[in-house]
């Protein structure tokens, strides 16, 4: 029964993570469209995360009433604040990177995320690696295959990525820095959720931090351009509303998933966004679908399922170990997996 509940939960996490990658590509496309119309990326962040915070307020209220949570101490708030500051930095880098380049390049650069997250998780002992175990070998090889697949999609038959245009280089550099910080944020997120296991509350504090930091940055960056704050009834308004909703939901799902599966599992879905972006541009924008996109997509899929298999194998071993080490095969196991 417990095993069935865990499998059902893992299925929901898997589905939710795939959906968030689709939404992430959509958000990046909207941000590119809005900034092309003259809307400042800093202002997009301020408005969207303020709107997202307002949406989360009633959910936070019900979260406090519906479950028993630990006291929200100053130390925990500082932990959430650090997470919010890191998120502010990578969001500013990311949205400006998209402004200088494109959503496709943003998806392409995300392939550095699994590698950095995996390395950092091993260094800080949040992920165990034993090359004598098939599960560990599968995770390592799956990570490498996914990154290779992402690079194939990006570089094979992709002359635009080799352009010497300065804006494209600036955009790529900003996006690379963004995904390095995203890797760091996953580890901080896992630590934060361990101390305060409420995805909604953590997301609310995260949103407020981004809105405040970006408001300060926007006042400095756009002090001579008051028109940058004007929201028109066109794609700019749609971008602010959609980004506020999707980014808040995206982060709630991420914090929930990282508390159950760890930061490496979370990062492994990033290469999927490249495949999603390639297919989306083919369907909606009429761009050519090259052999490199197909080959890279196959490699990403193989690597993705290898890591999932490795994680599932480890989870199964943990469950069996918990059963065998417990004098009672019911109560302790149930206590371990309450969420």
Curated annotation (Swiss-Prot):
- Every copy of the EamA domain together lies at 29-154
Principal location class: membrane
UniProt KW keywords:
Membrane, Transmembrane, Transmembrane helix
Its membrane topology: Multi-pass membrane protein
Taxonomy, superkingdom: Eukaryota
The record's InterPro entries line, in alphabetical order, gives: EamA_dom, WAT1-related
Tell me where in or outside the cell this protein is found: Membrane
Q: Where are the transmembrane segments?
A: 11-31, 42-62, 74-94, 104-124, 140-160, 168-188, 200-220, 233-253, 266-286, 289-309
Keyword Metal-binding on entry = no
Single GO cellular component term: membrane
Alphabetized GO MF terms: transmembrane transporter activity
Pfam families registered for this protein in UniProt: EamA
UniProt lists the family membership as follows: Belongs to the drug/metabolite transporter (DMT) superfamily. Plant drug/metabolite exporter (P-DME) (TC 2.A.7.4) family.
Protein name from the UniProt record: WAT1-related protein At5g40210
Organism the protein comes from: Arabidopsis thaliana (Mouse-ear cress)
């Amino acid at each position: 029964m417990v095993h069935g509940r865990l499998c059902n939960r893992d299925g929901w996490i898997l589905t939710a993570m795939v959906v968030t990658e689709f939404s992430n590509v959509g958000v990046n496309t909207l941000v590119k469209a809005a900034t092309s119309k003259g809307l400042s990326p800093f202002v997009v962040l301020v408005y969207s995360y303020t709107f997202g915070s307002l949406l989360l307020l009633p959910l936070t209220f019900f979260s406090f009433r519906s479950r028993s949570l630990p006291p929200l101490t100053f130390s925990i708030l500082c932990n959430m604040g650090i997470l919010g500051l890191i998120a502010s930095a990578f969001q500013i880098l990311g949205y400006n990177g998209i402004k200088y380049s494109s959503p496709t390049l943003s998806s392409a650069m995300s392939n550095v995320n699994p590698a950095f997250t995996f390395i950092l998780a091993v260094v800080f002992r949040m992920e165990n690696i034993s090359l004598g175990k098939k599960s560990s070998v599968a995770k390592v090889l799956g990570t490498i295959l996914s990154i290779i697949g992402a690079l194939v999609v990006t570089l094979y038959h992709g002359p635009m990525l080799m352009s010497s245009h300065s804006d494209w280089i600036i955009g790529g550099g900003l996006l690379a820095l963004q995904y390095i910080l995203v890797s760091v944020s996953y580890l901080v997120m896992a630590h934060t959720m361990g101390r305060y296991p409420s995805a909604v509350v953590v997301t609310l504090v995260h949103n407020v931090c981004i809105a405040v930091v970006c408001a300060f940055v926007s006042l400095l960056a756009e002090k001579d351009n008051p028109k940058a704050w004007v929201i028109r009834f066109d794609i700019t308004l749609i971008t602010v509303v959609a980004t506020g909703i999707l980014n808040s939901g995206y982060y709630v799902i991420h914090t929930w998933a990282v508390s159950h599966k760890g930061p490496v599992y979370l990062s492994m879905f990033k290469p999927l966004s490249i495949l999603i972006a390639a297919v989306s541009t083919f369907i909606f924008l009429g761009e050519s679908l090259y052999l490199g996109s197909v080959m890279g997509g196959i490699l990403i899929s193989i690597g993705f399922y290898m890591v999932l298999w490795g994680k599932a194998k480890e989870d199964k071993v943990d469950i069996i170990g918990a059963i065998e080490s417990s004098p009672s095969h019911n109560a302790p196991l149930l206590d371990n997996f309450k969420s």
